[in-house]
Regions:
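Short, small-residue-biased leader/transition segments that mark boundaries at the very start
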Residues: 2-3
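Conserved, short, structured surface segments that act as functional micro-motifs
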Residues: 133-176
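Zn2+-dependent peptidoglycan hydrolase active-site motif and core
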Residues: 90-125
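Generic structural motif
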Residues: 50-54, 82, 86-96, 122, ...
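Extracytoplasmic
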Residues: 41, 49-53, 65-66, 73-77, ...
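Short glycine/threonine/proline-enriched tight-turn/helix- or strand-capping micro-motif at secondary-structure
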Residues: 33-37, 59-89
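Intrinsically disordered, low-complexity
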Residues: 6-52
Length: 176
């Protein structure tokens, strides 16, 4: 899998060669538009990122049964049923801080929503984003993939986790 980091991209347009100028990338950076700011707090609301129903709710105070694993575990996320190929939208404005592939959640995107809050979207494919990208609420984060082996009985689903300063929070508390 290829993970794109926009901060590392280097194109001839950035160096001024296509415009015929000798302006350096450093000079162009000084005149670039300011970075988008994001803000989220305990009173903010999240849009639903997928159209399905919750098949496993957030539960960090008691264990819940995971059918595929045939065991009880704590669940730091909300697991939302969906159709493979379904578009997953950002629940809030954010900046992409991580794109990775894990055994449990497959292709996973993390958005910094501001003020210590992050949203984690797992079980994705065809992610059109790169680290550093600004994503507006409702904008495509990726498309739902087939489930990993950890969720094969549950079927295609979105792994949706919200954290505050690295600590898992119940996404349902913030949902519209």
């Amino acid at each position: 899998m290829c993970i794109i980091d926009r901060a590392e991209e280097d194109t001839s347009a950035e160096n001024g060669s296509e415009t015929g100028t000798n302006e350096s990338a450093e000079t162009q950076t000084e005149t670039a538009a300011p970075a988008k700011q994001v803000y989220f707090d305990e009173n903010s609301t999240l849009a639903w990122p997928a159209s399905g129903s919750v098949i496993l709710g957030y539960s960090m105070d008691k264990t819940v049964f995971f059918q595929t694993l045939e065991q009880y575990k704590y669940n730091p996320a909300m697991i939302i049923a969906g159709e493979a190929g379904e578009m997953i939208g950002a629940s809030a404005d954010g900046i992409v801080t991580n794109i990775e592939e894990t055994a449990q959640t497959g292709v996973t995107v993390t958005l910094d929503m501001g003020n210590g809050y992050s949203a984690v979207y797992g079980q994705l494919k065809d992610v059109p984003l790169a680290i550093g990208d600004f994503v507006a609420q409702g904008q495509t984060v990726g498309y739902l993939s087939e489930p990993t082996k950890y969720y094969s009985v549950e079927g295609p689903n979105l792994y949706f986790e919200v954290t505050k300063d690295g600590e898992a929070k119940d996404p349902a508390v913030y949902m519209e």
